[in-house]
Every structure is written in structure tokens, then in C-alpha cells.
Amino acid sequence: MKEVVYVLLLVLLVSVSDANETKPNIENFLRCLRNRTNPKNPIAEAIYTHENSTFASSYVSYTNNKRCLNPNDTKLIAIVAAKHESHVQATVVCAKSNGIQIRIRSGGHDYEGLSFTSSVPFVILDMHDLRSITIDVFRKQAWVDAGATMGELYTKIAAASKTLAFAGGVCPTLGAGGHISGGGYGNLIRKYGISVDHVVDARIVDVNGNILTGATLGRDLLWAIRGGGGASFGVILSWKINLVDVPKTVTVFKVNKTLEQGVTDVLYKWQLVSSKLPQDLFLRAMPKPVNGVVPSEKTIAVVFYAQFLGSARRLMAIMNKNLPELGLKREDCYEMSWINTTTFWQNYPVGTSTSVLLDRPSGPAGAFYKSKSDYVKKPIPKEEMEKIWKAMLKFNNMWMQWNPYGGVMDKIPADATAFPHRKGNLFKIQYFALWTDANATYANLGLMRDIYHEMEPYVSSNPREAFLNYRDIDVGSNPSGETNLEEAKIYGSKYFLGNFKRLMEVKAKYDPENFFRFEQSIPPASAM
């Protein structure tokens, strides 16, 4: 009996000790933040804890996937909405010294919520207030802070020049920090490549709280954060980017065709020609289930979106020669400036003011979603497409985006940056399912895995490649506080192919103790 009482007392003492250890860590962390920052740049107003009435709203404001939200997460210690670079430095140093993990959030477009969730004690380092943009028209360059959105960047570029642009994504609310570090895919890809192909310098806070840039950054680290994801190596503060030339007149179109209108034949032909078209032309195909002629019956429609760096007359000639099956008409085409195409890609009516590019999220995410990705090396047989359509028709709301490669992407070596998906790809697929009822989550996740399995014979293999910016936990993951090298090799080989080993070597040099880690981070080579 005495032994039982002793054991119970011991358990109680350990429990009390654990509870008391957690609280001092929080207090020590907050005290450290105040001590590590200059009073001229006070950090107090940047810190949100569970005691703040605005804590929950701060947490959800920059998270766009309701599936990943957990406002009552007891592991979340604080949110630091940095307003000065020194706040970032202090957060890194203080989190490390107190054994607290960091999640870095810029635009909140993390498809699996890895930038704002964790199963171990953590803080969110929110970058959205660091949003300065400086344009140098003469040098055709810009500095853009990690918290600036792509819409803000595009607006600033257009205000400075009508014939300059940046090769980035079409979504205006993407944060520059995460979007660029994961690759940065957009509709200028065939002409100019992806975002990381135009990064020439960066400012990054390392594991010791130092700001590395220029000569101190190191060519190996600059290589790694261009496509390897910055959050494995430090905190991206800003990027120095090269801008690209665009003509004063750019032409866009959007054409829909259904199964009943023979879209399967058109899409098969699209596979044969889309990566071989002139590199000034980007022609996306977007299959999705829609209501048929009879409302109770669904069919498949494919929306063909195009952007051409030139006139409608030249575009019509190219399309009539290469894809007459689409039946493009002159009235389908709209000529406009490059900046105005950015609203077109967001499905705004033609002529919508580009001021919408400056809109930022003001509340919690309204929908749940799941995304996956694939790379296609050879055309999917026409007779096999029926299987794909059947799998898609099981969803209430999903679509694919078939994004063409070719052009300059065939000329950039796979190891030029950490982003490896270059020559040999016809197109990249994004799968996207959207729903609003939490009770439908299980079913939709199952359907996404089903269609991903259905597509296996038609996509890359050994490994089955994946795009880092379309974060997908299904391709492999580690627990928040651990790093299993064998598991890391699984997702690392899919995201980075032959570049994964070099990424681990860079990681070992700049973060040997693996402080910057999360479920799909890059482990140091020393873990081998």
C-alpha cells in the first residue's frame, strides 16, 4: 500500500513539475522578446497571447484553409506579428533558447496549415506587416518583403512601368515569402520560367538571429531557398528579384467546352501541342464537373485559359494552326495591359479595376479544401480519359488545372535552383477539392485520394513527383517535433528529386541542430 501511495505522489509531483515548466517557458520567451528588441522598435504591440481579446482573430486572419484551423490550439503559445526586422531576429533567438518551435506565415496559403499548426509548443511568426516593395525601373529589379502579396507587387511594378512584370503566381493574395521560396509558378513560366529563376539576392534571418544577405548569404544557401522552401533554413525577410519585359498589349481568352461538345478530343490534342506552342503563349486547361443540360445530371467541362504576349491577331493565327479544334473566335479574345490580365485570371469581369489586387484577407477562411499535384511526361491516352471523368463526377466541387510546360523550362537545368521539375514534363496537374460543410471533410479527402490513385498510370513515377507549393501531407511527413530521415527521403525525393541530398547538406551547414523543422522540412545531412 505504501508503495502505491509513493508512486501516486511521484506521478503527482512530476505532473506539477511539468505544468510549472511550461508556464515559465512562456514567460521567459516573452521576457526574452522584450529584452532582445530596441525600445525604438517596441515589440509589445506585435505580440498576441491567449490573454489578448484579439488573439483568435489574429490567428485566423491569414489562414485560408478552414480544414487546418484550430483557434483553440493549446500548443500555440503566442503570435508575433513582426513590424520590424529586429522582431524576427528576437523571435528566432528567444524561441530557440526556450525550446519552442516556430511556424512562419506570410500569406497564409499553406495548403496543409504547416505554417500555423503544430503538435508541440510553438509560436507563429507572422510576416504580413513586413510588406515594403522598392522598384528600380532602370535596373529592372525590385526588393519585395516576405509579407507583401503578389497583388501588391504587381501593382507597384505596373505603377512604375507598363512594360515590366514579374514571373509569379496568378493569385494576388499569395505572400511573397512562401510563394517565391517554393518555386513560384505562374502564367509567364513558358517565356521566363518561375519566380526563383529571377531571385538574385535575399535577406534571411538564420538560426542564430543574424541577417544574411549579399556576400554573407552564401551561394549555397541562396541556391537552397530558391525552390527548397525558406522555412527549413531560416526566416525570409525579403527578396531581390529581376523583373521581366512584357509588351504593352497582352491578349487573353477563356473558352469552355463540355463532353457533349467533344472536349475529350480537344483536350487530347491540347496535350500534344500545349508544351510546343510559341513560348509567348500559356494555355491552361481546367477540367471540372458542372451541371449538364438536365440539372440533375452532371457532365465535365474544360475551361481553356490563355495568355499571349502579343496581339489578338497573332494569337488567332497560332491557335488556328495548332489547335483549330478549340474553335477560338476573335470575339473570345481581349487585348489589354499585362496588369489588367491579373484580374482576368481571378475570374473578375474584363475591365475590373486592378485595385482589387490590394485586397487582403479580413476574416477567417470560409471553406475547406484539399490539393494535390502531379507531373505528366507523356500524353494521357484519349480512351483512358473516361476513367478520369468518372472519378471527377463523384465530387460536388472539384477541378484540375493542367498547366503546360515547355518553352524556357526545357532549357533550365534541374539543378540550377533547388526546384527540379524542368525538362521532360508536358504539364503539371493541380487537383483541388472545395467544400463548406465540416461533415463532408472525410468524404472529400477520400475522393481526392481515390482520384490520385486513378491517375497513377498516367503520371511520373519512381518517384511520383510533387510540387512543393501545392503542399500535400499525403506524400509523406514527420511528426512536428521529430525528424525521421527515412520518412523525409520519401517526401524529399518527390518534391526535390536529385536536389534533396544537396539541400540536406546546406541544411547541415546553416542549421545543424535542426531548429527550423516541421512536418515536411528538410533534415540536416548529419542526421544520416
Swiss-Prot record:
Similarity field: Belongs to the oxygen-dependent FAD-linked oxidoreductase family.
Glycosylation sites: N20, N35, N52, N72, N256, N340, N439
Record protein name field: Berberine bridge enzyme-like 17
Example GO molecular function: oxidoreductase activity
6-(S-cysteinyl)-8alpha-(pros-histidyl)-FAD (His-Cys) crosslink location in chain: H109-C171
SS bond list: C32-C94
Signal peptide: 1-19
One of the Pfam families matching this protein, by short name: BBE
Organism from which the protein derives: Arabidopsis thaliana
EC number per UniProt: 1.1.1.-
UniProt keyword terms in alphabetical order: Cell wall, Disulfide bond, FAD, Flavoprotein, Glycoprotein, Nucleotide-binding, Oxidoreductase, Secreted, Signal
Main location: secreted
Record-linked Gene3D superfamilies: 3.30.465.10, 3.40.462.20, Uridine Diphospho-n-acetylenolpyruvylglucosamine Reductase, domain 2
